[in-house]
Swiss-Prot record:
This is Glycine--tRNA ligase beta subunit. The keyword Oxidoreductase does not apply. Keywords: Aminoacyl-tRNA synthetase, ATP-binding, Cytoplasm, Ligase, Nucleotide-binding, Protein biosynthesis. It comes from the Bacteria. GO terms for molecular function: ATP binding; glycine-tRNA ligase activity. InterPro entries: Gly-tRNA-synth_bsu, Gly-tRNA-synth_heterodimer. It is found in: Cytoplasm. It is an enzyme of class 6 (ligase). NCBIfam families: glyS (TIGR00211). The gene is glyS.
Length: 679
């Protein structure tokens, strides 16, 4: 007869960003625990609030399934001594399995007999197995952890309660400094300690204590309440998904309300207002039906609507203090001169091992000028790139960015326009930070693209040059994000400059402030980012084949990955790759000084293959180029079928290997085909 299991871990307030992944982790770890312990179940449902993580298992078997396992031991000739008695090796083997030699039988495997024993283990009651469920809680991993009281252990937050119920029976367990029971805590202000009656009554028991344990239900409540406010007030609310996910993990019983602020603050740039509300106060932004910002906000209270007017006033007061700061900085920053701010950047440290921000900008300016030539920018765009590179970090010293660092670049654009800078320069100041997150928006203008690349390239090379190279998951200077940004920009804009040549050209530059070093490490790091981008769809062998190609042009590499993945599902993929792989492997024996001499050809197949290689232009898209190379497969096979490549005559051998080397030199611009797996 199946049962339902409930586990709830009651904790001190969790950071909002930890709640959802921890809820998911708990469910996954418990499912693994039950499976490994042979306890079948029908379904798992997880719950979470800022003060609890919980999971309920439905249809849990009341007993483990019985286990029957066969174990292979030593060969019979080792298991028996000269008198036919079991040797110490055989005795030790069965002893290790908890059995005696009576359990031994011999089975033939590939012509030889071996010792085998079969072990039968009766399933234990679920209640007994579940005593080990604290292993699941102990194995939980978190981005942060802490000690409390005088305990030697640490956890994400102090644990207050542990409830483990099998139907309505409370199991007694010890975890950290807590003994389990059936007591849970209600809402911090609206509830009290309460008893969980059974696994099935969990939601209802806590709902009576003003706690909605189902995160999805809380989210639906918040959205529904916001929609009601929209209808009542005739407005639109920006329900930002990230903010919604954060807010639902800040509350156990949500109540949405609308507050107001003076319309005068709408004269401050919208980005400042939105940042103040969304990022700092966790408020939702309100707009009119035309999409214009309104002097209102929506917030979500952790509680009911009791004394809601006081709550609204308190939230309005806090927001106004933020908006006052924004208005003040907006007004005062406009009195500053860009040239003065740029001059002060010589005193701002980029990194103590690398130098000042001004020196970083100087290097970026030189790199940007080089990139502008490669990108064939117009004279006006080249001028804009140069000007932007001279000033693009000035806003870091403004009061606004000092208070709201999320607005770096955004305020730089606005202040630059107010100061009379060209629009292309101002836009590039904002765009050079892009992309600012995985999958984030990319710069859209050529000037912005060049400045973004130059800034990221110097950042990457500078940190690597002083030995600050990411290792493992440790990347304090966000160099992976910067490099991923470089790769994404190059791919999106189809910039076909070879990455190795680009990096080589940067290492040829000379600066008084820094000498670039560790080029090999830089290239490997960039390759790893390209590999990651390909890894979204391409298997390992395809990625390795492309990374081993003779071309390092990012857009082409990603296009080839897509083309190879599609081709791998076709009938001619395997034979084409196998013939090319054979050519690649033989070409490794080529003498680079030997050129193909057609006068040494002894059969038509040599001539046909050589002519086909000479006519191979590899034009068009990656898929078309791949098709052209694959089309040579019959010609290559015909060549191998009728030609002894490794001939005894050294001249013939060298000439035939040279033919294959010519083929490989062209095909390898696409991929190292001998790295591909056709099994």
């Amino acid at each position: 007869m199946s049962k339902n299991l409930l586990i709830e871990l009651g904790l001190e307030e969790l950071p909002a960003y930890v709640v959802t992944p921890s809820e998911k982790q708990l469910g996954e770890r418990l499912a693994t625990f039950l499976t490994e312990n042979r306890l079948s179940f029908e379904d798992i449902q997880t719950f979470s609030t800022p003060r609890r993580l919980a999971v309920r298992v439905s249809g849990l078997a009341d007993q483990q399934t019985d286990l029957t396992e066969d174990f292979k031991g030593p060969a019979k000739k080792i298991a028996l001594d000269a008198d036919g008695n079991f040797s110490k090796a055989a005795q030790g083997f069965v002893r290790g399995k908890g059995l005696t030699t009576d359990a031994i039988e011999f089975r033939e495997v590939k012509g030889e007999e071996y010792v085998y024993v079969t072990k039968h283990e009766a399933g234990k009651p679920a209640k007994e197995v579940l005593l080990g469920v604290t292993e699941v809680l102990s194995a939980m991993t978190f981005p942060v952890s802490m000690h409390w009281a005088n305990n030697s252990f640490e956890y994400i937050r102090p644990v207050h309660t542990l409830t483990v119920l099998l139907n309505d029976e409370a199991l007694e367990l010890d975890f950290l400094d807590i003994h389990s029971g059936r007591v849970s805590r209600g809402h911090r202000f609206l509830g009290t300690e309460t008893t969980i009656t059974s696994a099935d009554s969990y939601e209802a028991d806590l709902r009576s204590q003003c706690v909605i344990v189902d995160a999805k239900e809380r989210q639906e409540m918040i959205v529904e309440q916001i929609k009601t406010l929209e209808v009542e007030q005739g407005v639109q609310v920006d329900i930002d998904e990230d903010l919604l996910n954060e807010v639902l993990n800040l509350v156990e019983f949500p109540t949405a309300f609308m507050g107001n602020f003076e319309a005068k603050y709408l004269d401050v740039p919208e980005e400042v207002l939105v940042t103040s509300m969304k990022n700092h106060q966790r408020y939702f932004v309100v707009r009119d039906q035309a999409g214009h910002l309104m002097p209102n906000f929506v917030s979500v209270r952790n509680g009911n609507d009791q004394a809601i007017e006081n709550v609204i006033k308190g939230n309005e007061k806090v927001l106004v203090a933020r908006l006052e700061d924004g208005e003040f900085f907006w007004r005062e920053d406009q009195k500053l001169q860009i040239a003065d701010l740029v001059a002060k950047l010589t005193n701002v440290t980029f990194h103590e091992k690398i130098g000042s921000l001004a020196e970083h900008m100087d290097r970026t300016r030189v790199i940007a000028a080089s990139l502008a030539k490669e990108a064939n920018l117009s004279a006006e765009e080249v001028t804009a790139v140069d000007r932007a590179a001279q000033i693009y970090k000035f806003d870091l010293l403004t009061g606004m960015v000092g208070e709201f660092d999320e607005l770096q670049g955004i305020m730089g654009e606005k202040y630059a326009l107010l100061a009379g800078e060209d629009a292309a320069v101002a836009t590039a100041i904002r765009e050079h930070y892009l992309p600012d997150a995985a999958g984030g928006a990319l710069p859209e203008t050529k000037v912005g693209v060049v400045l973004a690349l130059a800034d990221k390239l110097d950042t990457l090379l500078s940190f690597f040059s002083v030995g600050l190279i990411p290792s493992g998951s440790n990347d304090p200077y966000a160099l992976r994000r910067a490099t991923q940004g470089i790769v994404r920009i190059l791919d999106h804009f189809g910039w076909r400059i070879p990455m190795d040549k680009l990096v080589d050209s940067l290492y040829d530059l000379s600066f008084d402030s820094l000498t670039y070093t560790n080029k090999a490490d830089v290239m490997n790091f960039i390759r790893a980012r390209v590999d990651k981008m390909m890894g979204k769809a391409a298997p390992k062998d395809i990625r390795e084949a492309i990374l081993a190609s003779s071309t390092f042009v990012v857009p082409e590499m990603l296009a080839v990955a897509e083309a190879l993945v599609k081709a791998s599902h076709t009938e001619n993929y395997k034979p084409a790759v196998e013939s090319l792989s054979r050519a690649f492997n033989l070409a490794e024996k080529a003498d680079a000084s030997v050129q193909v001499d057609p006068s040494l050809f002894e059969n038509e197949q040599e001539n046909t293959l050589f002519a086909a290689i000479q006519g191979l232009t590899l034009a068009g898209s990656a898929a078309q180029q791949l098709e052209q190379v694959f089309a040579l497969s019959p010609v290559i096979n015909d060549f191998f079928d009728n030609t002894m490549v490794m001939a005894e005559d050294q001249a013939l051998k060298n000439n035939r290997v040279a033919i294959l080397s010519d083929l490989v030199s062209k095909a390898k611009t696409i991929a190292a085909f001998n790295q591909l797996n056709t099994k």
